[in-house]
Amino acid sequence: MENELFPMDVSAPCRILFVCLGNICRSPAAEIIFKTMVRKQRLDGRIESDSAGMIGYHRGCPPDARMLEALKKYGYSNPGLKSRPVRKNDLEEFDLIVGMDRENLRDLKKMDKNGLAERKIVPMCFFATHFLDEEVPDPYYGDREGFE
């Protein structure tokens, strides 16, 4: 069902994809935290989320142990996520695609050959109210503090 004020099918769930480089640190953390927020607001079934990486190097791997440790510290647990690469059809299937850094955003826009998903692709920091950086730093090559 569409209407003039909200020109999308509101009977279908809103689908959000979080994207980082390898889908083992930032994007799965965003997905885990977001799913918890959705569940707490009782929006299950109305909002769906997933995560993916720009590269498939870690395909099938769980999130980085250091990220899981940091999430656990704040009360979050991994519901069994496994890394997967971004697919071209993700650009059509998701209503919002959230990139963690400029490189992710650039690569997502390159995948969008005809420009139809351009308005769906946004930076994660667009939603940050207390984090003033323009991108979420990749903690992979750093120490444990980078995962906090």
Where are these regions (language model features)?
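Conserved active-site segments centered on acidic
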Residues: 2-93
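Phosphate-binding/catalytic loops
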Residues: 2-7, 13, 96, 102-148
